[in-house]
Design a protein with these regions (language model features):
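Conserved acidic segment of CheY-like receiver
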Residues: 7-19, 24-28
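Acidic, metal-coordinating helix/loop segments flanking the phosphotransfer/catalytic sites
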Residues: 37-55
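Acidic catalytic/metal-coordinating carboxylates
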Residues: 39-40, 66-72
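Active-site residues of response regulator receiver
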Residues: 58-59
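Receiver (REC) domain active-site loop signature in two-component systems and cognate sites
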Residues: 62
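Alpha4 helix (beta4-alpha4-beta5 surface) of REC/receiver domains from two-component response regulators
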Residues: 69-76, 89-111
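C-terminal output helix
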Residues: 92-93, 113-129
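CheY-like receiver
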Residues: 130-144
């Protein structure tokens, strides 16, 4: 591993749809992240402990384990990175999940609708990699 690899931010894309998870990981890699994807959240706690990603993208609707229970796992595990909630559910559902995650102390950077706007995802990931705070990202996205 060279020095550049050691300084890359790590992103983990969690989605039961392997195509979606891999697409997010590829976009993140093009933005300079060391990116991985996983489709089975049952191993998430181990991966968080061993790999310690700085950014995690989470699909809320997965057959094996729903996103809300994953939010509980993230809280219990002390995840302190940025969380991007991604779902094909309506805006109310995504915003409610974002508020729940924030209330549990998670650092929600944004919530995105599937299919993901790749340009918006690239911009968001670039801003996160450059250290822009999540709250500032949400305010900018809302035109505040």
């Amino acid at each position: 591993m060279n020095h550049a690899d050691m300084t890359k931010s790590r992103l983990l894309a969690v989605d039961d749809n392997s195509d979606s998870a891999e697409l997010i990981a590829r976009v993140a890699a093009k933005c300079g992240y060391d990116a991985r994807s996983m489709t089975d959240p049952s191993a998430l706690e181990r991966v968080l402990d061993e790999w310690k990603p700085q950014v995690l993208t989470l699909d809320l609707c997965m057959p094996e384990e729903d996103g809300i229970s994953v939010l509980s796992l993230l809280t219990r595990s002390g995840f302190s990175g940025h969380l991007l909630i991604i779902s094909g559910q309506d805006e109310w559902f995504r915003k409610t999940a974002s508020r729940l995650a924030s209330a549990r102390g998670l650092n929600v950077a944004d919530d995105l609708c599937k299919p993901v706007d790749l340009k918006a995802l690239r911009e968001l990931l670039t801003q996160l990699a450059n250290g822009r705070p999540a709250g500032e990202l949400r305010r900018a996205a809302n035109g505040e």
